[in-house]
Amino acid sequence: MTDRKLLVSAGPHVRGGASTTSVMGDVLIALLPAVVASVLVFGTSALLLEVVCVAASILFEYLFRRITKRTNTISDLSAAVTGLLLAMNLPAGFPIWMAIVGCFVAIVIVKQLFGGIGCNFANPAITGRIFLLIAFAGQMTTWPTANSYIPGIDAVSGATPLALIKEGAVDSLPAVKNLLFGIRGGCLGETCAIALIIGFVYLVVRRVITPTIPVVYVATIAVMSLILGYDPITMILTGGVLLGGIFMLTDYSTSPATEWGKVVFALGAGIITMLIRNSSGGYPEGVSFAILLMNIICPHLNKIGAKKPFGVGGAEK
């Protein structure tokens, strides 16, 4: 019999019609409405930041794989997705060199040093954002004026809605229509709720994701908002709830495979998000930290709802 070299890659080992490239391509397509909205709201500086983050992420992955003499994986588009998601988590006008540092952390340290796609312990983009938030807090919390591209909706400048809530300036909150169309302060991908919802529908229709995690996450945010005395609509439409719930909590590598595991995963993320938002600490937003914490305990959640193989556990007495 002919000897063959077999390479066992990271699980799950599931055969299906969709390749990594097609899945990542669908994610990029789903993000396009948010990209367009970010340019309409913040101008060409948003597009520049997005292009640089995508290019830097692809370059870092290519160089790392080449230096370590591994098969290059830039064609699977996962590096492009990471770069674009990181850009979506940055404010317009964020220094380019700092964004490139964030791409290095996301691609090289979080993704490639742990073995590449499917082996990372946490979502690379969200970890890169947290690193930048800690290292460059001032730049990560500087918000430019949001331009109005919809007649009848005024432009909004200054703090984000969550920062206003933290300061007790509830009367200064943008109207719901501002939140829906993204005409308010925030990161590039956090502002326009309608664009993110369009992306969500596309991913569900294409069967790239199931609605379980986003729906349970948003529902948990709503319930926790009522318990803690906040307006649920405002809590859902502000910050990174929709961006994180749709595009980052659903990451294949760092989310549970079982249906009940997904429910607990999203439930935990929603509770942690609202507890951080309600705390008296310096961070008005809790989505990033909630996702990272749930990513870390994800392997344990895969045991919830998992079916036992036939013959395991012994006979009933």
Protein language model features and the residues they cover:
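N-terminal signal-anchor module of multipass membrane proteins
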Residues: 1-58, 311-317
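Alpha-helical transmembrane segments in multi-pass membrane proteins
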Residues: 26-34, 49-61, 78-83, 87, ...
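Generic transmembrane alpha-helix motif of multi-pass integral membrane proteins
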Residues: 37, 82-91, 105, 197-203, ...
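Structural signature of hydrophobic alpha-helical transmembrane segments
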Residues: 43-56, 93-102, 179, 183-192, ...
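C-terminal ends of transmembrane helices
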Residues: 59-71, 107-118, 196-206, 246-255
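Membrane-interface helix-loop-helix junctions at boundaries between adjacent transmembrane segments
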Residues: 78-79, 84-152
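Long hydrophobic alpha-helical segments that form multi-pass transmembrane helix bundles
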Residues: 119-197
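Loop-to-transmembrane alpha-helix initiation sites
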Residues: 121, 125, 234-241, 262-265, ...
